[in-house]
């Protein structure tokens, strides 16, 4: 897969001036438990190992703890973090609906460890989901037979890949998935899927031959003077509004590394290999190049497992605004889907 600035936009799409390189909320990356309106603790801090780094996050537990709970594994989209950038609001909704949630920051981002800081690698992040599952099944409150993976934008593509590899996954939720702007080629002999599976399960993904795009701003209001990875004005507005909030640990800078892949590889080739039902929540008016709804629909048609499609308005970032009617529509559809396949 040729790594270019356009590819970054393609893989990322995001889920998420002074000195743009310094813009962000850079407080001490420390998380604390938090209680709901009734005084019940909503989550506890957790950590687990992945690719020689410690990843950190929150384990949300429902109020009814009389039995083991189904769990949703959540990681945010491109460069975004778990505190204050809307994924935490989705986690709270799932907890209210009776699900446990493990929400964590990807390697190199937020409160998780890993170097180089703010470097994004699709394969390393995908492996993080699998290592997270390894961890969560050891928790006494969790029903290890009822696990869902969740992703938005770039991480939707990661959850999709993981759902084609890990037999423990029983449901897959993808919001505004970033399946790139090109249609997947046919994987006649299954070798492209086999490559992806082998790559994700490698013990040292970063030790594989790879290329790196150096740090640059994620968003910018001045594409001539300070060009950025994401050029859409909606991306700029969302990232600055949500990432700039106190305590997010988000910074407006990113580098991107990618392993060498076969020329025709495309994550959509994993569709026939999914191990579980999938929900796709798709913005039919998505403005991001790498979240082309037509490409997503072609991949949807390739899925052999039970599948559901939900159209949503608001472009790529509409359902990431909280509170909003689009957030409510999205979370309701997800809870209905998860109740069907995890309860």
Predicted regions and their residues:
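Conserved alpha/beta-hydrolase "acid-adjacent" motif
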Residues: 287-295
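Alpha/beta-hydrolase-fold enzymes
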Residues: 160-241
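N-terminal cap/lid segment of alpha/beta-hydrolase-fold proteins
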Residues: 31-67
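Short beta-strand/loop motif that positions the catalytic acidic residue
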Residues: 274, 280-282
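The serine-hydrolase catalytic nucleophile loop
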Residues: 79-92, 106, 292
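Catalytic histidine-centered segment of alpha/beta-hydrolase-like enzymes
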Residues: 315-327
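Catalytic nucleophile-loop/oxyanion-hole region of alpha/beta-hydrolase
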Residues: 82, 107-144, 324-329
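Conserved alpha/beta-hydrolase
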Residues: 93-113
């Amino acid at each position: 897969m040729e790594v270019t600035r356009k590819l970054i936009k393609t893989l990322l799409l995001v889920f998420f001036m002074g000195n743009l390189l310094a813009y962000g909320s850079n407080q001490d990356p420390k998380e604390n438990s938090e209680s709901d309106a009734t005084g019940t603790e909503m989550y506890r801090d957790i950590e687990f190992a992945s690719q020689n780094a410690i990843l950190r996050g929150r384990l949300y537990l429902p109020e009814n703890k009389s039995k083991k709970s189904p769990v949703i594994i959540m990681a945010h989209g491109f460069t975004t973090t778990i505190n204050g950038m809307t994924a935490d609001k989705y986690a709270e909704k799932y907890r209210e609906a009776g699900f446990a949630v493990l929400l964590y920051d990807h390697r190199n981002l937020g409160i998780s460890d890993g170097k180089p800081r703010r470097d994004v690698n699709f394969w390393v992040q995908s492996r993080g989901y699998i290592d997270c599952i390894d961890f969560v099944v050891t928790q006494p409150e969790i029903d290890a037979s009822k696990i869902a993976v969740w992703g938005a934008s770039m991480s939707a593509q990661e959850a999709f890949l993981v759902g084609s590899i890990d037999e423990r996954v029983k449901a897959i939720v993808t919001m505004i998935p970033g399946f790139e702007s090109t249609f997947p080629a046919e994987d006649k002999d299954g070798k492209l899927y086999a490559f992806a599976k082998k790559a994700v399960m490698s013990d040292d993904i970063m030790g594989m031959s790879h290329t790196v795009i150096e740090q640059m701003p994620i968003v910018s209001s001045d594409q001539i003077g300070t060009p950025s990875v994401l050029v859409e004005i909606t991306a700029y507005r969302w990232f600055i509004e949500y990432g700039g909030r106190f305590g997010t640990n988000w910074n407006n800078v990113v580098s991107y590394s990618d392993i060498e892949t076969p020329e025709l590889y495309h994550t959509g080739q994993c569709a026939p290999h999914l191990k579980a039902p999938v929900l796709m929540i798709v913005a039919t008016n998505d403005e991001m190049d790498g979240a082309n709804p037509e490409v997503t629909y072609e991949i949807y048609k390739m899925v052999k497992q039970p599948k559901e499609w939900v159209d949503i308005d608001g472009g790529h970032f509409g359902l990431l605004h909280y509170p909003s009617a689009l957030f409510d529509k999205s979370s309701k559809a997800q809870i209905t889907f998860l109740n069907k396949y995890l309860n």
